Amino acid sequence: MPVAPHELRDTIKSRDLGLFQCIDLLKQHNDNIGVHHQLVQKLYSYSYDELEFFIPQFIQLLVNFETDSMALEDFLLHYCNQFPHFSLIVFWYLQAFLFELRNEPKSYSFQTVRKFINKLQNILFNVETSFHIRGPEFRENMQPALILCGSVASAFSSPLVNEYALPIVRSQGKQQKSFVFKLASFQKSLTRNLTMKNQRLSADAITPVISDDDSKVSNRIQESQRLKTKYSKKKISAALQLDDSENYTTDEEELGYVQTLSRPKIREMKYTEVEENLKINTIIRSKKNRSKTTVNSISFFSDTDQSASMEEYNRSAQSLPELVRTRSRLDLYSSESEAALGTSRNSAELIISKKKFMGSEVKTRPYKELLKILQVNYSKKETSFIMSLQNISLRLSSVPKVARLSALRAELSIINESILPSEIDIPQLLPVTSNKNKKFHKILKLNINEACVLNSAERVPYLLLIEYLSDEIDFNPFSDQNQKIINDCVRKPEVKPNDQISGDDDTSVVSSIQEEMFLDNNASENYNEDGDLGEISLLHSRSSSRDWAKSTPGSPVARSSQEDEKFYGNVSSTTGGTIESSVLADQMRIASLMLQQLESSGQSNTQQFVSIRNRIIESMISLQDQFDFIDYETLKELKTDEQDAGKRKLENDFKLAEDWNEKKHRIRKSSIYGHLENWDLCSVIVKNGDDLPQEAFACQLISLISNIWKKHKVDFWTKRMKILITSANAGLVETITNAMSIHSIKKSLTELSIENGENAKGRIFTLKDYFQKLYGSVDSSKYVKAQENFAISLASYSIICYVLQIKDRHNGNIMLDHEGHIIHIDFGFLLSNSPGSVGFEAAPFKLTSEYVEVLGGLESKAYLKFVDTCKNCFKALRKEWGQIVSIVELMQKGSSLPCFNNGDNTSVLLQQRLQLHLSDEEIDSFIEVYLIEKSVGSMYTRLYDQFQMITQGIYS
């Protein structure tokens, strides 16, 4: 039913309009530009936390709901400019959409994602875009032009009309409606550029051959004059650019001139002489300039006066940026190169130059640009860190299971050495810090010993413990630490990808490694006839170079280590030497890569293959024991009971089952950063899988339902899980601490009782046995409290499972925490899909006789509490049914997620399950008879548990 315009206006202005109601109105009125703009203006009134929660819905509106309005895009770009966390989350979601739409390159959705993601790349990875390039503010659009003319004419009688019209005209005027003018101007500029390029080549070709001495002086003078002239012309022409395709030329000479002006006189003369010698009798450009052009799109400062056409060209480019993953060790090689060339200065000169340079960039650049440098530095390091974590999981999948833990530790050690500690945190998973008055966290290191590979049928997820400093970093360009970062970013030497040992080109890495193994005479003396990798000093030369760099006062490595020592304390005595750890990591990585090559050689049936494979695996296992060790004596002191933790860790769950506070205390005591006051620990799972976006959506729905219950003051309990999507099939999952799956509880208790001779018949332990073992007798206060927690959480998740049709509820996907709460995980099947497309789980939700036994029977107080909680939760959801149905209706359009297999019927069936036609009295009967009685001891539930026990070994 259409709403009257004045009613819609009052609704938008109302303070009671919730954020999701505003999003729903955006979906309904996406064809009305004026209403769309008013609704987007309303978005600015909501808090950052609310807006970040609904980022997937904003992206869905932008991509799958076609509209002529530019308001939502401008809003997202504005927030991406303002909040680094917001921009990264949007960027990763767009990458997932881009992968999903890869087979539809001509669709509206793909074109929208492509254009927006390229604009976002300029925000994330480009410093100069916002300050030196201004795109056209008004294009050839009829409608905004007419509105502009009309508002100017009506301003004489109604001056305030401009306040309403200006935002719409400004936003809609940037929209490109036709490519006719763009193509025409592009052809003109292309012809002009080719003509200029040919003239320049002709001039270089007919240059008379003169003596070297004369050419050095004359060419230097001519080049300087030419650059000055061109530099001034460029600045004038850039200011006159109106169309986005006017100029596609590069400004290498301009960049060279600017950099030359900033160099000391001696360095200027040396570089100019080298460059002039390269130009004699040739038209080939110097390698120095060519390398700068190659990395122009990802460097911090490229062509400072690049035209607006290059910005638009980058936006329309099909490819994503290749981020340069700079490593701290790479600064070492530049120092060695300067020493070899005789151009390095002594330590006294370095100290003087450092004092002169320190703060110069802060003084000469505007505040917004300094802020942008820090934000770009954060974005580059963050994306590089996340990509490194994702690549580990992919590489582990090609490594045999017995060697995966060794390979994982090697990979994590390399990340610790090359990236961390750094200005990096994890959006969403760590506490929210994107508010203006809060600082960001800073990741210090990945705990290698506590990392473990989790069991999975196809993928290789792994558990990661991350040490970080809470509220440690910000974007204040005037702090001492950030001034160092700014100066390092501006002075940072460009790095060739070949110098990175952790690069993606595994073949070249292994080739160079093998060459070093078999050609280095020093290394050949260190291994025996068997060629055990554990005894090969593969990186002796790099170890020596690290020693040299650390002993050289002026080297970057020495400076960084000295600064770290001042801030973090003297940690060398604790680590036992970072050089040995780095060599071990490199050796493990080498062995892992060689093992991957061996597996892909296609000779797995030969005896030689098996022999080599076994030797490599044995070497990796022997190497893994040489990493940082666990202090078991300290561990025993920290334990409050007499139970041996090693006996209980039968599976991965036991890695998670250790009390979180005890684990933090133990790790902090052994950490080199543990003495810092704001030290903290975070546990995440790095996971690859096609169902991760669906799991993230399920967690969002559960959080939305929990918010509804909280609003209506319902007694409920749910665990709010967080999943950070970093690509179409990868992400980080928050670890549930102090909890174990019911499968692991049953299996561990049963096997331990058999091992101790207490269970000769092999009876499987029940949940009640576990509760009594953990909380004491049935009448104890501790047991009663845990029983109540179990009842409330069981009721909450039961209603969620029914409403959202969450399936695959075997005991491996249901957990219990240390307080007795039940927690559901793994939401690969919900709304409209089920395991194997077979309706095994026909019961409304899982309510086994074992659960009833824990509650104390059908007449117990805890069971009645369970029934009442079910009723209250279901009634509250019916009152807010519009939110749940609308968000599913919004997300199902154009989605390829398996949970939307039913298409538009998905939201229809969801609404039907809420039984909106029944009264509250009828709902009580519906819950008791249809939901609970059909679920108690359901035959379908028992069959599914038995099926999982037989096929997957999951205890029922």
UniProtKB/Swiss-Prot annotation:
Pfam families: PI3_PI4_kinase (PF00454), PI4KB-PIK1_PIK (PF21245), Pik1 (PF11522). Residues 664-670 are annotated as: G-loop. Residues 1-120 form the PIK helical domain. Keywords: ATP-binding, Kinase, Nucleotide-binding, Nucleus, Transferase. InterPro entries: ARM-type_fold, Kinase-like_dom_sf, Phosphatidylino_kinase_fungi, PI3/4_kinase_cat_dom, PI3/4_kinase_cat_sf, PI3/4_kinase_CS, PI3K_accessory_dom, PI3K_accessory_sf. The keyword Thylakoid does not apply. It is found in: Nucleus. It catalyses: a 1,2-diacyl-sn-glycero-3-phospho-(1D-myo-inositol) + ATP = a 1,2-diacyl-sn-glycero-3-phospho-(1D-myo-inositol 4-phosphate) + ADP + H(+). One of its GO terms (molecular function) is 1-phosphatidylinositol 4-kinase activity. Residues 805-813 are annotated as: Catalytic loop. Residues 545-573 are annotated as: Disordered. Its EC number is 2.7.1.67. GO terms for biological process: cellular response to nitrogen starvation; endocytosis; filamentous growth of a population of unicellular organisms; Golgi to plasma membrane protein transport; microlipophagy; phosphatidylinositol phosphate biosynthetic process; phosphatidylinositol-mediated signaling; positive regulation of autophagosome assembly. Residues 658-939 form the PI3K/PI4K catalytic domain. Residues 824-848 are annotated as: Activation loop. Gene3D superfamilies: 6.10.140.1260, Phosphatidylinositol 3-/4-kinase, catalytic domain, Phosphatidylinositol 3-kinase Catalytic Subunit, Chain A, domain 4, Phosphatidylinositol 3-kinase, accessory domain (PIK). One of its GO terms (cellular component) is cytoplasm. The C.albicans mating-type-like (MTL) locus contains, in addition to the genes for the regulatory proteins (MTLA1, MTLA2, MTLALPHA1 and MTLALPHA2), a and alpha idiomorphs of a phosphatidylinositol kinase (PIKA and PIKALPHA), a poly(A) polymerase (PAPA and PAPALPHA) and an oxysterol binding protein-like protein (OBPA and OBPALPHA). Acts on phosphatidylinositol (PI) in the first committed step in the production of the second messenger inositol 1,4,5,-trisphosphate. Belongs to the PI3/PI4-kinase family. Type III PI4K subfamily. This is Phosphatidylinositol 4-kinase PIK1a.
